[in-house]
Amino acid sequence: MAVTKLVLVRHGESQWNKENRFTGWYDVDLSEKGVSEAKAAGKLLKEEGYSFDFAYTSVLKRAIHTLWNVLDELDQAWLPVEKSWKLNERHYGALQGLNKAETAEKYGDEQVKQWRRGFAVTPPELTKDDERYPGHDPRYAKLSEKELPLTESLALTIDRVIPYWNETILPRMKSGERVIIAAHGNSLRALVKYLDNMSEEEILELNIPTGVPLMYEFDENFKPLKRYYLGNADEIAAKAAAVANQGKAK
């Protein structure tokens, strides 16, 4: 049976991950640790014999720079890359820039967990005159006002990620090309929920660690056979637990 593999990588730790702030569409860069995580992911993929034909990422530099570092370690800096806003992190609305633990102290752990992980729950909206509104950013100049979020739930994130998967990424994989996607915690959770047919309750508890290759294997009909991380299982579990704890009051 022919098996097709897909590699997903959540960007390495960003400066705002380090500061425990809601990031969303804010274009913050990787921390030093994040750069190291991305390089380590590339080294691990190289050790396991991976190489690629095409890469996808978002239009946010923490994902773009993660991909750069991964491909550099693979000696594939030349690889063709498509950047799409549809792979961006979920938009966190008026929470963007706020400290997660301080927000939990103000609103409670459960409310913040719902804002972070609830399927259909949206954080408080931005207003269009807010400097954080993506309509002020030239990289989104060609998007319609309807496409520009004031806030997003995971459900709304799925509404942009999955059509892009089905219409753009999957056809390339079906043509036989080997694909890597460098994206974000929630855009990748959106894809995992879809591929694994997860319930809303199951996806609530899924936390994807930064800078760790997440592997999928598909059968000849492109149905997922298995999903697993590359790397030390104990270290990965600890990183995932740390992601879960970010939204709790100190």
UniProtKB/Swiss-Prot annotation:
The gene is gpmA. This is 2,3-bisphosphoglycerate-dependent phosphoglycerate mutase. It comes from Escherichia coli O139:H28 (strain E24377A / ETEC). It is an enzyme of class 5 (isomerase). It catalyses: (2R)-2-phosphoglycerate = (2R)-3-phosphoglycerate. The keyword Isomerase applies. The record marks H184 as: Transition state stabilizer. Its EC number is 5.4.2.11. The active site is at H11, E89. Catalyzes the interconversion of 2-phosphoglycerate and 3-phosphoglycerate. Homodimer. One of its GO terms (biological process) is glycolytic process.
